[in-house]
Amino acid sequence: MQLRHINIRALIAEAGGDPWAIEHSLHAGRPAQIAELAEAFHAAGRYTAEANAAFEEARRRFEASWNRENGEHPINDSAEVQRVTAALGVQSLQLPKIGVDLENIAADLAEAQRAAAGRIATLESQLQRIDDQLDQALELEHDPRLAAAERSELDALITCLEQDAIDDTASALGQLQSIRAGYSDHLQQSLAMLRADGYDGAGLQGLDAPQSPVKPEEPIQIPPPGTGAPEVHRWWTSLTSEERQRLIAEHPEQIGNLNGVPVSARSDANIAVMTRDLNRVRDIATRYRTSVDDVLGDPAKYGLSAGDITRYRNADETKKGLDHNARNDPRNPSPVYLFAYDPMAFGGKGRAAIAIGNPDTAKHTAVIVPGTSSSVKGGWLHDNHDDALNLFNQAKAADPNNPTAVIAWMGYDAPNDFTDPRIATPMLARIGGAALAEDVNGLWVTHLGVGQNVTVLGHSYGSTTVADAFALGGMHANDAVLLGCPGTDLAHSAASFHLDGGRVYVGAASTDPISMLGQLDSLSQYVNRGNLAGQLQGLAVGLGTDPAGDGFGSVRFRAEVPNSDGINPHDHSYYYHRGSEALRSMADIASGHGDALASDGMLAQPRHQPGVEIDIPGLGSVEIDIPGTPASIDPEWSRPPGSITDDHVFDAPLHR
């Protein structure tokens, strides 16, 4: 069997078991040697005509099924007979009875082997035929002349063929399990008769098909949700490779979102769940010879629930995200991983995280957190902003010798839009920050090697979430980057981030109105009174301090927008734009070179309070800040327009 497109390992997982393993276990038995032992017992004793007839009938069954294969003779027939004869008495009438029982075992085993081999041959023939058809279909799929309708029909055919392979394998599995169970029942009955005749069956050791009957595998206890990543990692590394694969195949929902499980393994589990969510709808459409859109339009007609449809839609958005990021550079593709996946989270908005590059092996990892209006359901994982892709490509260009993995983290419930009243409160940021901290802290546990560098970047409401992950959730990372931040909630200064030698970096365009909301911090501090557990009290209005302000303790980098001549809401979405000042700076920071911002001329002065000039006798005119006023004066306003460009691209490696 030469399969080009069917993955046997994946097929076994989808079918629920391995028919080849069952057939192999049956063929480990040695029916010919059991038959020879039976002949020796039969010949050694005094037998009646009835015993002789029974033996000959069993011998005919054996001869009809045995495949005449020779093998080693691990036992000495005469020695075994002599041992039993000494125990039972010479010329005992029991010896021929033992011979009959043994011959029946040999016949049962030979029949089971023949049936199993025939069923496997049929299955392999079916799979070969399906694989050949898949080859033809996939070849046609590359034909540019195909019309849209023809391409849709071809996709449906491919899906149908894949399901046929699963169904055929599952059917073979069931039949082989039945064959083995039948042989096992007969074996146990024959062994009982042998013991009754005085034979302990020692001569059968290793001959009667091991693993028959199959003992049910002991369940593997999976750590419950909320278990710390270090404990989960110790548990995972204690498992054998076979046990890990079994858990991924049987319990992907539990493994895929378990911090402490390596990224590649949790991705395999999450992709298995995502694929199942997609195929649940696609298979129905194929079965009824209709379109997926028809099924989605009237799910009840096809026996599907609203939850099935939500799972499908968010799985589809997630799959688009994986495909979009995987096609980043066809000449030098980077692997993508589904780090997290829960299509039903947040009332059906979905939860997912996609990694470009493997955080477990990359020297640097950047985690980006989006803001308002972002969700799996809304397509953030594959929309045209390309936040993760742009950062990945520029960080890679900045330092190709020390790769940076980038995680697009859509792991919290962001406000729906700017009309969502929750946007004015930090509630979602605090809840999301706790989840973010758990995921990021787990990266340190599974990382291979030493010297990892982790940067967490948040945009808009996502920057408030990042701030709370540090200040409230105990998130551990080297650096933080806040973009267009409307306020840092519980992080009242850079010290609240508890960075060990790292920095809080801030990108705040002087024309971005959202980044100015933190200047109203006096109101938000008054009404947002959070206890140590982060429970909101009072009115909970406002999002906290402006991190771009003088005195916060952050490092501000340039993030201006070319040709912007005033406050513009669109400038709030420019930070990840390719060629922007902000992306250039973020690429340096994420690749571990934040200290290069000064030499590259990318630092910006913080905002400060307005001042007044006072003439002081003997000192002259002195400007002082007006007490109680927000840091509303932005030095970036005074930059010449010609100095703001969008050509800040790493065309050649800067750091080696």
From Swiss-Prot:
Residues 623-656 are annotated as: Disordered. Residues 645-656 have a biased composition (Basic and acidic residues). This is Uncharacterized protein Rv2079. Pfam families: Abhydrolase_8, Hydro_N_hd. It comes from Mycobacterium tuberculosis (strain ATCC 25618 / H37Rv). It comes from the Bacteria.
